[in-house]
């Protein structure tokens, strides 16, 4: 495996960024920690890339922790888009294959690579994400509050919840 642990990955990214003169990317906070309730999603299987944050463990939603050892690939996009897409496609198809209804992105970087670049990920894996989609934490919270986020229309992977 190319990046066995996150420390090795971080060092490799740092090395490539220095060589290629790429500015450090913004750090994205884990938006999953902002979720306050999930009563309407008890019947859904929700995949998350990493471990379940403590604030979500009390909810009765059916979370599937992918515990991905590899990063989503976002930091590699400018240096090696093909490798970034391979990393991301492994994660999104692990979520798809797990039987999850959707993947919950923990930040904008994950949303960008998993949804905005979904067609490239499908091509990279030579597979189709039929009837699968990605949600932002803010969109999930809005849906929980019976609101329809306007951004759902802009998703590459079309959201079909109800």
In which residue ranges do the predicted regions lie?
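Iron-sulfur cluster-binding electron-transfer modules in prokaryotic oxidoreductases
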Residues: 1-162
């Amino acid at each position: 495996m190319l990046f066995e642990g996150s420390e090795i990955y971080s060092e490799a990214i740092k090395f490539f960024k220095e060589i290629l003169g790429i500015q450090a990317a913004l750090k994205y906070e884990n938006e999953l920690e902002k979720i306050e309730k999930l009563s309407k999603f008890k019947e859904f299987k929700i995949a998350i890339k990493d471990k379940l944050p403590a604030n979500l463990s009390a909810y009765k939603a059916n979370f599937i922790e992918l515990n991905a050892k590899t990063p989503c690939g976002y930091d590699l996009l400018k240096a090696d888009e093909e490798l970034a897409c391979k990393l991301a496609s492994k994660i999104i198809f692990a979520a798809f294959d797990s039987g999850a209804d959707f993947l919950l992105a923990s930040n904008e970087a994950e949303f960008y690579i998993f949804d905005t670049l979904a067609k490239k990920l499908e091509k990279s894996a030579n597979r189709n994400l039929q009837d699968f989609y990605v949600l932002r934490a803010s969109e999930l919270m809005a849906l929980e509050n019976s609101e329809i986020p306007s951004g759902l229309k802009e998703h590459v992977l079309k959201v079909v919840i109800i």
